[in-house]
Structures are given as structure tokens and as C-alpha cells.
């Protein structure tokens, strides 16, 4: 997110987006969600949820700690009604099972359903996928397949469809974003 001083110096044009990631481990270093200059942001992505290797569904690495942070972020959103809160899945250290979760239609459906359930249960506004990286690269131990590129697109499609269905049920417009490599 940068330091509060850096954030205070920035201005954003009407209609623009200012997205920040809040890393769950930042609280261990004394930077808690209530210190985020939310008035300067339109969206906060909570980093990171992971993919459970056994069920290939969304999971929190440290549920008690993460739940506390998510509660603090929801409180911050109450004080900043313009703010969207998303769960970010993956990142450098937790992308190893994306390829497995995206490999088949059944797995994509299950993973997407778990994300939608998580968003609804946690009172969030959407999901950010941070798969580092489809096909090749990323941290040691990350699983890759040649079909990752196509499967990632299909995973995004499945997740978007399930989020839209949920949105029609509860009258909300859920966001789906990705963190992608450039170049």
C-alpha cells in the first residue's frame, strides 16, 4: 500500500481506481488494517488465500489471524462506504496448485464455487486471482501444464459465471480481478 504519506500525496481522478493489497502478515509487523488510508483507495485486496492441495478449494493459511484481519477490513469498509474488499488467491508463495484447480471442468467448477461461498460468507465484494504463473515460472514447486493458459481463461469464465449467478440471487455486483504479468 505504501506509506500513509505516499498515499496522502496521491490524487485520483473521478471514476479512476486505486487498488491496494493488504498482506495478512503486515499485522505481525505492526501495520494493522485500521492504519490503511482507505479514503485514498477504491479497493483493497486481502493477500493471500491459498488453494487447499487436497480439496483444490480456497483456504486460509492461518484462519484465526486471517479472520481477525478480514473483520478489521470489513470495519474499515463500514467507515469508507466507497471501498471494495476482495480476497486475493495465490501470490508468489501460494500459486502451486492453481494448475490442478484449473485442469478440468469439474475442478474449475468446484474451485469457483468455493470462492463464491467464501466471498458471501466473509461479506466481501469479489475475488482477485494472482496465479504466478500459468504455464511456466513462479516459485519452486509450482505445478505447470501446457494447457494452463487455456485453463486459466476457462477458470475465469467459470468464476465470473458463478459470481454473476450469486449476484442475481443477492442483488450484488461481484468483482473479479487478476494480477497478471506484463511483457
Predicted regions and their residues:
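An acidic- and aromatic-residue-enriched active-site/binding cleft used to recognize and process polar
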Residues: 90, 132-134, 179-183
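Aromatic-lined carbohydrate-recognition surfaces of secreted/lumenal glycan-active proteins
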Residues: 149-183
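Hydrophobic residues within beta-strands of alpha/beta enzymes
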Residues: 44, 127-129
Amino acid at each position: 500500500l505504501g506509506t500513509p504519506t505516499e498515499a496522502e500525496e496521491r490524487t485520483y481522478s473521478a471514476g479512476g481506481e486505486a487498488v491496494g493489497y493488504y498482506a495478512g502478515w503486515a499485522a505481525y509487523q505492526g501495520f494493522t488494517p485500521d492504519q490503511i488510508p482507505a479514503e485514498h483507495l477504491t479497493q483493497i485486496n486481502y493477500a493471500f488465500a491459498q488453494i487447499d492441495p487436497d480439496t483444490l478449494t480456497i483456504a486460509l493459511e492461518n484462519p484465526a489471524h486471517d479472520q481477525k484481519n478480514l473483520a478489521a477490513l470489513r470495519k474499515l469498509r463500514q467507515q469508507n462506504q466507497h471501498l471494495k474488499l476482495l480476497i486475493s488467491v495465490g501470490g508468489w508463495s501460494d500459486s502451486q496448485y492453481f494448475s490442478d484447480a484449473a485442469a478440468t471442468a469439474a475442478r474449475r467448477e468446484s474451485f469457483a464455487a468455493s470462492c463464491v461461498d467464501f466471498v458471501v460468507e466473509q461479506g466481501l465484494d469479489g475475488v482477485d486471482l494472482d496465479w504466478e504463473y500459468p504455464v511456466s515460472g513462479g516459485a519452486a514447486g509450482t505445478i505447470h501444464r501446457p494447457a494452463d493458459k487455456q485453463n486459466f481463461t476457462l477458470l475465469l469464465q467459470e468464476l465470473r459465471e458463478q459470481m454473476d449467478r450469486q449476484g442475481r440471487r443477492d442483488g450484488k455486483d461481484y468483482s473479479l480481478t487478476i494480477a497478471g504479468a506484463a511483457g
